[in-house]
Amino acid sequence: MIIKPRVRGFICVTTHPVGCEANVKEQIDYVTSHGPIANGPKKVLVIGASTGYGLAARISAAFGSGADTLGVFFERAGSETKPGTAGWYNSAAFEKFATEKGLYARSINGDAFSDKVKQVTIDTIKQDLGKVDLVVYSLAAPRRTHPKTGETISSTLKPVGKAVTFRGLDTDKEVIREVSLEPATQEEIDGTVAVMGGEDWQMWIDALADAGVLADGAKTTAFTYLGEQITHDIYWNGSIGEAKKDLDKKVLSIRDKLAAHGGDARVSVLKAVVTQASSAIPMMPLYLSLLFKVMKEKGTHEGCIEQVYGLLKDSLYGATPHVDEEGRLRADYKELDPQVQNQVVAMWDKVTNENLYEMTDFAGYKTEFLRLFGFEIAGVDYDADVNPDVKIPGIIDTTV
């Protein structure tokens, strides 16, 4: 079939398998052209491995450090008549290229929050890898079925303690509008912490450690975003921020557990990028459109692969890591450059419907958004007939 982008709200409901493969190849080429990661990991588990930062971590470990990788994700395959999810095509492409390079690459499809998927992962590590020396935690999910209670909990994107009104960008209608959000209830805050906080990360590390599949000296990191003042009301000081603060708490006990065997656990702070998750946050499209304009003009603009490759090379496995007072690894320092933030703040209230394309890089934002789904990739013929039924050989599918 010939596949064109169809966008509804903050989701593109079509995906392009050839475009997704080309996007993965671009990221691999970036890593291989920037040289190996010295003393990098060799056997890596990535939880949330199919898109965005998790995919970038898998690519960086495999092609920057020659690592065997096991990826966990929750995606949907395509059929002859309907495209699958972008994450499915990304993972199929990654495995193809990794296998061509002689690397082990296998994937588990299922709910990473479940005990079942944790057990299948442990069994696969024991059978195929023995032990892993890096665990990357990069889940972004709107809800979680708690493995102990069976309750399905939802996360909420709301301020805490007060209602907030802010400028946002309606990406469908391409207009600036005021968005008002009521404060989260305590139940909504607790739910967001349960879905997006550190409990599941801790459960993963506990399960892996108890099963004896963590190598001595193993490291783990969970990805987070902190942002600057302009996004704080909705982000760091909001319900999501409560979940992020929970990560900061949970990492301490995880670190103690791994340190006993010469290992380490860190929260890694990454810059704002266009992802399916960030495009759902009301103020982020406007913030990102301004940020892209400023950072591109300064020559400091980065996407997922530049961020994560740099994180592994400079901080996770580097001699002089970028660490903050809380012990987090920081890869977002170029975004937080005061010059960058001051320019974004100065332009924030000046953007109108009329000057949107001149004042911001909304065009770049839209391109990045479509690239998530395999569109707008250079060199891809989007008028060609493609088969959306792409197989991932050897996938362990716990959903069937």
Swiss-Prot record:
Its EC number is 1.3.1.9. The keyword Lipid metabolism applies. PANTHER family: ENOYL-[ACYL-CARRIER-PROTEIN] REDUCTASE [NADH] (PTHR37480:SF1). It comes from Burkholderia cenocepacia (strain ATCC BAA-245 / DSM 16553 / LMG 16656 / NCTC 13227 / J2315 / CF5610) (Burkholderia cepacia (strain J2315)). The record marks 75 as: Plays an important role in discriminating NADH against NADPH. Monomer. InterPro entries: Eno_Rdtase_FAD-bd_dom, Enoyl-CoA_Rdtase_cat_dom, FabV-like_NADH_b, Trans-2-enoyl-CoA_reductase. NAD(+) binds at residues 48-53, 74-75, 111-112, 139-140, 244, 273-275. Pathway: Lipid metabolism; fatty acid biosynthesis. The keyword Lipid metabolism applies. Keywords: Fatty acid biosynthesis, Fatty acid metabolism, Lipid biosynthesis, Lipid metabolism, NAD, Oxidoreductase. GO terms for molecular function: enoyl-[acyl-carrier-protein] reductase (NADH) activity; NAD binding; trans-2-enoyl-CoA reductase (NADH) activity. HAMAP family: FabV_reductase. This is Enoyl-[acyl-carrier-protein] reductase [NADH]. It catalyses: a 2,3-saturated acyl-[ACP] + NAD(+) = a (2E)-enoyl-[ACP] + NADH + H(+). It is an enzyme of class 1 (oxidoreductase). The active site is at 235 (proton donor).
